[in-house]
Regions:
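Conserved catalytic network of the ASCE P-loop NTPase/AAA+ motor domain
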Residues: 41-44, 55, 97-101, 191-196, ...
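P-loop NTPase nucleotide-binding core
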Residues: 57-194
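Catalytic acidic motif of RecA-like/P-loop NTPases
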Residues: 52, 56, 205-216, 223
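Conserved strand-to-helix beginnings and helix N-cap segments that scaffold or border functional pockets
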Residues: 117-121, 212-219
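Walker A/P-loop-proximal flanking segment of P-loop NTPase domains
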Residues: 1-95, 121
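Catalytic P-loop NTPase motifs of RecA-like helicase/translocase cores
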Residues: 114, 192, 207-211, 242-243
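The catalytic "switch" region of P-loop NTPases
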Residues: 2-24, 29-33, 69, 196-200, ...
């Protein structure tokens, strides 16, 4: 008796598949990718852009291709010349000979990291790893050490922590640590962009699949500590699911939920 097997037509976002679908425009998205690249290139100052779509709509594929296109355009990226030409030729782009005119792109899978206590640590680590950085932090003001103390007080719903801090003998100590953390992150981003590019584009994927506490914590930490004029954040999200996440975390709905979402994004 003949048994038919159901074929799996899912295209995984491997590097090979990302390039193949670009070459033949199999997904019919090349024009959108080109428009999106130019949109990102036109960003001035700190900005956040949301790529909104339901689960299974191809958001991950789209932002991984966008990451690849941005880095292919940058002459200091590690993409091989043959691959670079394949990527850019299909989008009518040419390789730049000046990194000052280019962006750098980083892909961060939030869902893979949602067991981390402090999202900011895994995000900075991912940036350093993907850029091949050997950045050395001052052990006296290492933000990995500062992060635990400062972020516990200034993130999430930890109002009690803020009140206790204000009652302490030195109520400004945490605020000073906060400023030290901000300065270390600015130094880090300056090092990341030095002789590599003009702006950094950080793609954050799978945010709406994370634990509510991680999602809110990550967005708050980016807002408070990683807000930089040289960075564009691209959030791959399902807006409806993100609204549920915010509602579950804060216990609010309606206008208050939308207001909190607007502030976070």
């Amino acid at each position: 008796m003949r048994k038919d097997k159901m074929e799996n037509f899912e295209i995984l976002p491997t590097e090979e598949n990302l390039i193949k679908t670009l070459e033949a425009d199999l997904l019919g998205r090349n024009q959108q990718l080109s428009y999106f690249y130019n949109l990102l290139l036109a960003q001035k100052g700190a900005s956040t852009i949301a790529v909104d779509g339901k689960w299974g709509s191809g958001k991950t594929f789209f932002i991984k291709q966008s990451t690849m296109v941005i880095n292919a355009k940058n002459p200091v990226s590690i993409i091989e010349k043959e691959k670079r030409e394949k990527i850019l030729s299909k989008l009518f782009l040419t390789e730049s000979d000046n990194y000052d005119d280019c962006n750098l792109a980083i892909y961060y899978d939030a869902w893979e990291n949602d067991n981390d206590t402090d999202p900011i640590v895994s995000l900075v680590y991912e940036i350093a790893k993907q850029l091949g950085m050997t950045y050395t932090f001052d052990p006296d003001t290492d933000f990995f050490k500062l992060g635990g103390a400062v972020l516990d007080v200034f993130s999430g719903k930890n109002l009690k922590g803020i009140i206790e801090n204000l009652k302490s003998d030195n109520p400004l100590s945490k605020f000073k640590e906060q400023k030290a953390l901000e300065e270390k992150l600015k130094d880090f981003f300056s090092e990341a962009l030095n002789e590599r590019g003009n702006r950094l584009v950080v793609f954050i994927d799978e945010l709406d699949r994370c634990k509510p506490s991680f999602t809110v914590r990550l967005l708050e930490q980016i807002k408070h500590y990683m807000h930089d004029e040289r960075i564009t954040y691209v959030l791959s999200i399902n807006t409806e699911e993100l609204q549920h996440t915010i509602k579950n975390y804060y216990g609010c709905g309606g206008d208050e939920r939308r207001d909190r979402q607007a502030r976070l994004l």
